[in-house]
Design a protein with these regions (language model features):
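Active-site and adjacent substrate-binding regions of carbohydrate-active enzymes
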Residues: 1-268
Length: 268
């Protein structure tokens, strides 16, 4: 039996808890990836990946909202993001979702989710396919075991009908899907691309090796190195251009992170 701890708290508390259990959820990653994409500045994300627990399960979305407390300050102790950055992050989510997340968050809904924003991750990014694929690429190329929530796998949009029915803010990201809805979702180019990205990640032997992260201005690089292979995810957060390069048995490969490039590889 293994213990996987689910706790929303100050980031240093999370680090300490990780030393005392088998695994923890990385709840700091979702807001940090959003902040990087919104601002074009991945420095806070790079800093976190330098110190984050390696015995973690990474997420971008879950059955709950997008946590904010995990990157915020605690009293006079600074957080991974400052108050102004957090305010900007939350407002950008509300703007990208055309106000839908505002309707589902805090006093607007029956549950007072003051520490999280209720919204699908896809809508938090304004349903921007390229930004969404980059977010997932960062998640699955970071240390830990990546967990992809079912609504995230299908790039689901906010379920405003369910929210109106229940008035439970978190239900905005808890869609009921029948067989037809799943089949239709699997035909979406962004979903095909995401599945191809996951398959690529799972095929790379380097990802059981040593991890390092480098950042220069708007460029973030996630590097993996093992005895016989290497892999690197490079993301330009200013231009939203990303790629994976990897070598196995001395052969170099390059894959662009884009809907067209990845979606085509599903049937290749």
């Amino acid at each position: 039996m293994k213990c996987l701890v689910e706790i929303h708290s100050y980031y240093k508390t999370q680090i300490e808890i990780a030393k005392r259990c088998d695994m923890v959820y990385d709840f700091a990653m979702p807001p940090l990836v959003l902040h990087s994409l919104f601002s074009g500045d991945p420095s806070a994300l790079a800093n976190w990946l330098q110190i984050s627990p390696r015995n973690c399960v990474t997420v971008l979305d879950t059955h709950d909202g997008i946590g904010i407390v995990d990157v915020g300050p605690e009293g006079d102790k600074p957080g991974l993001l400052n108050a102004a950055q957090i305010d900007s992050l939350v407002e950008q989510i509300h703007q990208n979702s055309n106000g839908q997340s505002r309707e589902a968050t805090g006093a607007a809904a029956s549950n007072l989710d003051l520490y999280q924003v209720n919204c699908t991750y896809y809508n938090a990014l304004g349903a921007n396919d390229q930004a969404y694929l980059i977010a997932r690429a960062v998640q699955i190329f970071s240390p830990g075991i990546p967990q992809v929530y079912y609504a995230g796998l299908f790039a689901a949009e906010n379920d405003m009908a369910l929210l109106a029915k229940t008035n439970v803010g978190r239900d905005i990201n808890r869609p009921y899907l029948d067989e037809q809805a799943v089949s239709e979702s699997l035909e979406k180019p962004v979903v095909k691309a995401l599945i191809a990205l996951i398959r690529l990640r799972n095929s790379l032997a380097a990802l059981v090796g040593e991890f390092s992260v480098t950042q220069q201005e708007n460029i973030l690089r996630l590097n993996w190195q093992s005895d016989q292979s290497a892999a690197q995810l490079t993301v330009d957060f200013a231009s939203l251009v990303a790629s994976v390069t990897y070598s196995e048995n001395g052969i170099e490969h390059h894959v662009d992170i884009s809907v067209d490039s990845l979606a085509q590889s599903v049937t290749a």
